A protein has these predicted regions:
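Intrinsically disordered, low-complexity terminal regions
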Residues: 1-67, 71, 77, 128, ...
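Surface-facing alpha-helical segments and adjacent helix-coil boundary elements at the starts of domains
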Residues: 48, 63-79, 83-102, 107-113, ...
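Feature marks extracellular polysaccharide-active and adherence modules
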Residues: 69-71, 90, 99-102, 109-111, ...
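Short, charged, surface-exposed secondary-structure boundary motifs
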Residues: 118, 136-138, 219-221
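Extracellular beta-strand/beta-solenoid scaffold signature
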Residues: 132-142
Length: 281
C-alpha cells in the first residue's frame, strides 16, 4: 500500500478546512501535484505547499494511507465524507474529524475537537485522546446524528455525546460530559468512566452501557426511567461480546463484561420509553 505524508510546517494563523483531502482524491497524483491542491484558510484558499511538506511513497492509490504529522488542532474536517482508505493523524486533530464518513478508517493519535463523527454512516474512527462536545451527534441544523460505523474514544468525551444518534456503536473509555445519549434514536453507546448529568435525556430507543463497575461511576438515573423486570441475560452476553471485540486487545473497562451482573432501566418514558440503560456492577 502506498502512503502520502503531509507534515505541518507551522501552525496556521486561522483555521484550515481539509475537506476533500482523502486517499481517493489523491489517487494517481505525484507529490508536486498534491502540493498544488488548494484548501480553505480562513476565508481564502491557499496551496497545500504553504502548510505542509508533502512526500509520497509510491504512486497514491484510492486505498492509500494518508498520514498527517504535527499539531493539526487548527485543521478541521479531516476525513470528511471519507469513502475508503485510511487516514492517520499523528497528533491532535481539529473539529469535525470523521464527520459524514461512510467507509474506511481514521485514526487520531491524540485528541480531537468538536463534532467528531457527526452524521458518520460507516467505517471506523479511533481517537487515542479526548474528544470535544457533540461527538457522534448531528451537524448543526440536522435531525439525525451518527448513522452507522464505529467510534472509539480512549480518553474522555464532552457534552451531548451521541445526541440524536440513530445507528452504530460508540465507545468512550473515560468520562463523558452532560447529556450523554440525549435524544438517542437507536444504536449502542458504552461508557467506561463517569457520566455527567441528564443521562439519556429524551432517548427513544437504543442501549447505553455503563461499564465502570465502581459505585462512584454509576450514573444518576432520571425518574423518567424505570427498572426493567424482564431478564435479558442472552442479549447482554451478545452486547458484552461485541463491545469487547470493538474495543480491541486493549479493551480496558470493556473486558470481561459478560461475567458481570447488570441492572437495567427502561426509558425515557417522557419520549418513547423503549431505550435501555445497562449498568454493569
Amino acid at each position: 500500500m502506498s502512503r502520502v505524508r503531509l507534515a505541518v510546517k507551522q501552525a496556521p494563523s486561522l483555521r484550515v478546512d481539509l475537506r476533500g483531502l482523502t486517499p481517493s482524491a489523491m489517487a494517481g497524483l505525484a507529490a508536486a501535484q498534491i502540493e498544488r491542491l488548494h484548501v480553505t484558510h480562513g476565508t481564502q484558499t491557499i496551496a497545500l505547499a504553504e502548510l505542509f511538506t508533502v512526500a509520497c511513497d509510491g504512486t497514491p492509490e484510492a486505498d492509500s494511507e494518508l498520514l498527517f504529522e504535527g499539531d493539526l488542532s487548527r485543521f478541521d474536517r479531516i476525513g470528511w465524507q471519507l469513502a475508503g482508505g485510511r487516514i492517520v493523524v499523528a497528533g491532535p486533530a481539529g473539529d469535525y474529524v470523521g464527520a459524514c464518513m461512510t467507509a474506511g478508517e481514521v485514526q487520531v493519535q491524540g485528541s480531537a475537537g468538536l463534532l467528531a463523527a457527526c452524521e458518520m454512516a460507516g467505517g471506523t474512527l479511533s481517537i487515542d485522546g479526548d474528544v470535544g462536545d457533540h461527538a457522534a451527534s448531528t451537524l448543526p441544523g440536522s435531525m439525525d446524528g451518527m448513522r452507522g460505523g464505529t467510534l472509539i474514544v480512549r480518553g474522555r468525551a464532552g457534552d451531548r455525546f451521541g445526541d440524536r444518534m440513530r445507528r452504530g456503536t460508540a465507545l468512550v473509555f473515560g468520562d463523558v460530559g452532560d447529556f450523554p445519549a440525549s435524544r438517542l434514536v437507536a444504536g449502542t453507546i458504552a461508557i467506561g468512566g463517569r457520566a455527567g448529568a441528564h443521562v439519556g435525556y429524551g432517548m427513544r430507543r437504543g442501549s447505553v452501557v455503563f461499564a465502570g463497575g465502581a459505585p462512584s461511576l454509576a450514573p444518576t438515573v432520571a425518574p423518567t426511567f424505570v427498572p426493567a423486570l424482564a431478564d435479558a441475560a442472552v442479549a447482554w452476553q451478545l452486547i458484552a461480546r461485541d463491545l469487547a471485540r470493538v474495543a480491541g486487545s486493549d479493551n480496558g473497562p470493556f473486558a470481561g463484561l459478560g461475567a458481570r451482573r447488570t441492572v437495567r432501566y427502561l426509558g425515557d418514558l417522557s419520549a418513547d420509553g423503549r431505550g435501555e440503560l445497562i449498568v454493569a456492577v
